[in-house]
Amino acid sequence: MKNPLKVKKKGIICHETPSIKGGVYYCEYFLKICASLIFRHARVIVKSVILCGKVTERMYDEELEKKLEKIDINGPAPLEEPERQYYFIKKCRKYVKEKSEELGRPLTACSRTFGCQMNARDSEKLLGILETIGYQAVETEDADFVLYNTCTVRENANLRVYGRLGQLGARKKKHPHMMIALCGCMMQEKEVVEKIKKTYRFVDLIFGTHNIFKLAELVSICLEERLEELEAQGREDKKPKHKMVVDVWKDTDQIVEDLPVERKYSFKSGVNIMFGCNNFCSYCIVPYVRGRERSRRPGEIIGEIKNLVEDGVVEVMLLGQNVNSYGKGLDEPLNFAELLEEVEKIEGLERIRFMTSHPKDLSDELIEVMAKSKKICRHLHLPLQSGSSRILKAMNRRYTKEQYLALAEKIKTAIPDISLTTDIIVGFPGETEEDFQETLDVVRKVRFDSAFTFIYSKRTGTPAAAMENQVPEDVVKNRFDRLLKEVQDISAEVCGRDVHTVQTVLVEEVNDHSPELVTGRMSNNTIVHFPGDASLIGKLVDVYLEESKGFYYMGRLNQ
């Protein structure tokens, strides 16, 4: 059923909600600033325009609203989570509502994500909390609340954040009530936080990767500081002073998931199954900023996916720094292959994806489960990093070139239609031309569908940063260009293997450049463009692949 009504006035979007019997109309702004919301169903879906021009589905949970109604914000905050955060959500709502009424418009929030799928999923949670507080999500950074969820895997990511912070500082001078928050992996580095304290004093809030669930509480603290500043402005005996709130945890064993989420897509979703990493590859900062491995309980994961399916999700992406090591440390151990079998049993779920896999932990059992599955997508991201056994040892990857090649062959034999993708680093300290040729040899033998190629980035605090024989920049650039050409040439050949066949495609969006086309993904993660309209979004359809363009297909609906 299509919405017959979609009215946009002064940034307020009203929709008919088809899921409610009789067609009740709601104003999005009203929904977002009210302290209590009453619906006939436990979950009501309201479409709204959010970041990057995408359409998302905002899930309002009646149960959460009932909990919020019972909370007395004049009393002490609960100690248990997530009840403690519900308290601060309601407390922040009061301020946002009052400020919105004062300005005569809803307060807006913009979230920017740098980095991996884990960060993207974290950002959905952060934006969900902000919207539940009462902020309206927008695309541009001239918002009332700007949040950067940062990445620190490579130095360039840090530099991008610093550059954009300078622009935000200029905006904040014009709009003093604006709030700026920074979180994510970059904020776990002590020297980064110190630099921000000294150079970017206008930032309001800094927190890390371990306590993103505390956003409402931290925003509440910032708002209290803001009120104190305003009070000081009217007093001669006090000079207003901006206070930056910093709350970065070194590590945690706490997992808090039962909080609002603002999903980018209504039909697919990421699901965290574990956090942290125990591998300590010598070049990687992740274990230091994400902490040690900790797995979620299987029942919580299955319950979350079932709820997502009830809300219309047909595809999930199981997320973890190394999903293959899932289950270690649980009271009742369950390995990743066994978890996949349980997820497969969920009725209504059509597709299962996962990332990332570490080659040393990829078991025969997992390959067998993937081979017989009707739901696990035919795509496996298996980071290589280097084809040289000598360099792999220096990287602390704990496998050799020969072991990787044997594993890739085993996977392709068991699952002939699998799409293998990878990560490769060029210019690791001590890498010789011979080492680089070993990498090219693996690329030619495995014939990856695609590869993310990176120039080694020295990260302070990692063992590799202190290694001698750093490779000269011009040599690294030359190798990178040669590797990229090799990867692209092979990918163009491999990715065209399904031309003139019919494949099932999950339609994701109307094409940005050609609105008469829609764009979707095959099971093996290859992009397909074909004629269609927005009514196909979120549906699995059969598409005839007419032409291969090297890295994507052009097709038509197979009717």
Predicted segments with their positions:
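Proteins enriched for Cys/Gly/acidic motifs involved in redox and nucleic-acid/cofactor modification
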Residues: 52-326, 365, 380, 402-409, ...
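N-terminal amphipathic/hydrophobic targeting modules at extreme N-termini
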Residues: 17-24, 34-35, 41
